[in-house]
Structure formats: structure tokens, C-alpha cells
Amino acid sequence: MDLRQACDRCHDKKLRCPRISGSPCCSRCAKANVACVFSPPSRPFRPHEPLNHSHEHSHSHSHNHNGVGVSFDWLDLMSLEQQQEQQQGQPQHPPPPVQTLSERLAALLCALDRMLQAVPSSLDMHHVSRQQLREYADTVGTGFDLQSTLDSLLHHAQDLASLYSEAVPASFNKRTTAAEADALCAVPDCVHQDRTSLHTTPLPKLDHALLNLVMACHIRLLDVMDTLAEHGRMCAFMVATLPPDYDPKFAVPEIRVGTFVAPTDTAASMLLSVVVELQTVLVARVKDLVAMVDQVKDDARAAREAKVVRLQCGILLERAESTLGEWSRFKDGLVSARLLK
């Protein structure tokens, strides 16, 4: 039996369901500690029709490669706030175990890694004889599912921005260690006074493992974005190189805002604007992390870890800003060349 792509709670609120593939529940239901239920649809799913019916057969095939074509929910682009309690009247079920931040980050990292492996490299796609450039322009989009890749990229970038906001504060508020609990103990004649704590020195106050997971997700996302940027530059180069009277059959991904479908000639511009905006948000998240690390660098319990994390953050921030700059210049160049509206 087919089930909705969104859980009942997200469906009723008309929100995109942020459930990661392989996870038993979505992050909204996990945060609210309520049941995440997927019911049959009220009417059959209907795959979206491709924009260019005459010559987009390969794009239509790739768009429906994973079953139902589910596009990115643009109305829910940056909806990162907490959701309200479950509406009354819904069936009550025992809530599934709430995923930890580490589980959600690990699932996101695995999804990004699979995406990177699925996108052909520059060596595989961007080397072609000049004599075959025209034929190559008509088939360049058949090497991978561009629509699905971009939809997933936007989903994962939004999820990472949300997880940054949760994981960074949690990394600086680790649970109290045994030695610290002994020092804070107010129980009269407590037995802890007759035993030796496992650690004679306080454990680090920074959760280095959790921070490394966050940064690993961001690095892998940048790997995917850099690969797609190379693909975009190759397409732009072909447009500028081919004869003026030749219109290559590039498969422009479909952009939907509610029931509105953006025209093909403006869809690419909208897509680039959203990618740049999401990268801007992620750069700001790294800067927030740097500021928080700087606040604890003089704490004796976090000094060494803070130095390592600060260096990692600096490297990540430099690369994130570089990737953001590349996408911004790419978009501006296309606008200047009147290839985008």
C-alpha cells in the first residue's frame, strides 16, 4: 500500500516532511516527542510532467527514477522553528525513540556521501572533442538525475542549517562528568566520598565528536556543491561556444512554489538564488560556531580542544566562503551574459 511522502502531522500543517531516508520518524515529530505516522494518500500521487514535453524524455525518465517525483517545498525553505503540539483527534500511537543529534547528523552525512558518489565527476563529464560539442550539449543532462540531485541538495542544506542551530549549543553543554558530580554533590554522608572517581582530572567541556560530525556534513555538502558548480560552468561554456542559431536541449529543473510552476527561462535564476541564500546561511552558522569556540578557549577544561576546533572552523569557513563566492560570481556572470533573467 502506498503511503504519503509526508507524515500526517506535516501533511495537516501543509509543511514539507523533513524525514531523512532510513529514519523511522521526521525531525519535527522527534522534537515534539510525538508519533510520526504515515497514512495512505487521500488521492493517488500524480508525477509532475516535465516542462519541455517535446524533447525532455530523458529528463522525465530521470525525474521519476525514484518513483514519485517529489520536488523541494519552496514555501518551507527556511522554516527552522519549533512546531506546535500535535493536533487533537489524530490517532494516538506509542512515540518512536527520539533520534539523537548524532544519529541525525550521521544519517545526513551518509545521504550527502551517497549523493556525491552519484554525481559524475568533472573527469567523467566535462572532457569532449570540439567536433562533438553539439551532440554532447544535447546529452549532457542524461548522465545523472539533475532534478532529484538538486531537490536533495536543497533539502540537505536546509537540514544542516537546522542541525547547526541545535548541535553547536549542545556541544558546549555536555552532561556533568562523574568528577564534576562529586564536586557538586550535596547528599549528606554520600558514598562517593569513600570511592575514587574514574577521572582524576575534569573531562573536556567541548563535545569534540559532535562538532566533528557537524563539520563533516558541511564539508561533504561543499563537495557536492563544488561538483555541481563545475557542471554549471561547463553548460555555460557550451552555450557561449555553440553557434548562435543552435539552442541546446538542456534539462532545466522544475521549480514549484505551491501550485505555481516557474517558467523554464526563470527557473534557473530562482534555483541559483536559493542555493546562494542557503550557502550564505551556512557561512553564518560557521561564524557562530567560531564565536562560541572563542568564548571557551581560555577555559582550562576546553583550551586544547578549542584550539583544534578553532583551526578546523577556520579551514571550513575559508572553504565555505570560497564556494559561496564561486556560486555568486557564476550567477552574476550568467545574468551579465543575459543567459538568466
UniProtKB/Swiss-Prot annotation:
GO molecular function terms noted in the UniProt entry: DNA binding; DNA-binding transcription factor activity; DNA-binding transcription factor activity, RNA polymerase II-specific; zinc ion binding
Main location: nucleus
Protein name (record): Transcription factor ACEII
Naturally occurring in which organism (per UniProt): Hypocrea jecorina (Trichoderma reesei)
GO biological processes: positive regulation of DNA-templated transcription
GO CC entries: nucleus
A UniProt-annotated Pfam family: Zn_clus
The encoding gene: ace2
Bilayer-spanning residue ranges: none
Known role: Positive regulation of the major cellulase and xylanase genes (cbh1, cbh2, egl2 and xyn2). Binds to the 5'-GGCTAATAA-3' site present in the cbh1 promoter.
